[in-house]
UniProtKB/Swiss-Prot annotation:
It comes from Escherichia coli O9:H4 (strain HS). The gene is brxA. GO terms for biological process: defense response to virus. This is BREX protein BrxA. It holds the Pfam family BrxA. InterPro entries: BrxA, BrxA_sf. Keywords: Antiviral defense.
Amino acid sequence: MRAAFQSSEGFSMIKNDKAWIGDLLGGPLMSRESRVIAELLLTDPDEQTWQEQIVGHNILQASSPNTAKRYAATIRLRLNTLDKSAWTLIAEGSERERQQLLFVALMLHSPVVKDFLAEVVNDLRRQFKEKLPGNSWNEFVNSQVRLHPVLASYSDSSIAKMGNNLVKALAEAGYVDTPRRRNLQAVYLLPETQAVLQRLGQQDLISILEGKR
């Protein structure tokens, strides 16, 4: 960490930066795993039960205990931005409901995703562009370093992984057709998704999620 940020004000800035990024490194939407975690959260498990289910029973079908714990921690952090009614939709609703709500959770836990959607994806659509350029994430990061200096503390590989996770999440939520082709697509929120945002006091996100802002 650079000396310029060693003051208490600097530490606050770095802390806020970390909150802006959230756990984007943790993965894209992880729909199947998130459904399983939502089901578990709805049982209000204590820590022992949580560990038994995640590690002992390997309910995420992960390749190792550490991978299971890492995925579970990331998903729980994201789902905790929602309410129990949203968890029920993620656990029992349609795939489209689940993906829209998981994208909302990702945005709430990693506000960098909201900014990328508003400033890059939606701007491209306003310009009637057809594709999300392959370098759009790196250009966005470069444009944000002064405002969010913690970005400079991440390795190139970590920045690239964040970008890959973000593009995969955009594809899962329908904003691009595939992570490889990146053809831009319109997204219309389901009534259930809009209701969750209203309940959470996040109705301002509706216009961003639908590309109107």
